[in-house]
């Protein structure tokens, strides 16, 4: 209170003022590196048989981002297939049994019993093109919309005219129990860039592709069987943390 009125400031002698400044500078020098580390975004590079791409993990979905980073650092995704690919929708990976799967075998059913609490953060993170999200079981068996611990997908999607997007917005509002789930700014991006708006508010988006989006396009175009598995394997050769940036 005194500082706001200016009384204490004017009563300070030069030595006392210098002491206060030194303490203040030391405090900032200690706090700044810590806050800097907390504000960095982790990036992960995927090297695949179809090319390379890099994703950025979001800071404000800490449970998913940290868990995913731990899996990457442990080498979990190395050698796994993109076992489910749907053109104009998304590509999916993370089934541990896909590493040595024979051709034509149905994949995607195996998963860890562990699940992650949802971190759905609309309207900030949604299913625009290039979004990285975790798969999950349906609402019938998973009403809490908890995420798979390992299986992720990357959105490609398609563009929407306002008329085509209108019924999707209505269905999403019904699914989430909220009005205006897809905001006007989100709708504009779906109309011009594309994505999968029907998933909004129901799955956790925790990252985005920042490099190599053309590789996602290439993968989502491959020929698949009746189970959406690519006829020719698309494999993750390696996934690694390539750095952190502010």
Regions found by a protein language model. Give the residues of each.
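Charged/polar low-complexity intrinsically disordered segments
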Residues: 2-7
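Intrinsic-disorder-associated, low-complexity terminal segments enriched in Asp/Asn/His/Tyr and depleted
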Residues: 9-11
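Bacterial N-terminal signal peptides
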Residues: 22-31
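Positively charged n-region of N-terminal signal peptides that target proteins for export
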Residues: 16-21
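Intrinsic-disorder-associated interaction segments
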Residues: 14-15, 179
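Cyclophilin-like peptidyl-prolyl cis-trans isomerases
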Residues: 34-246
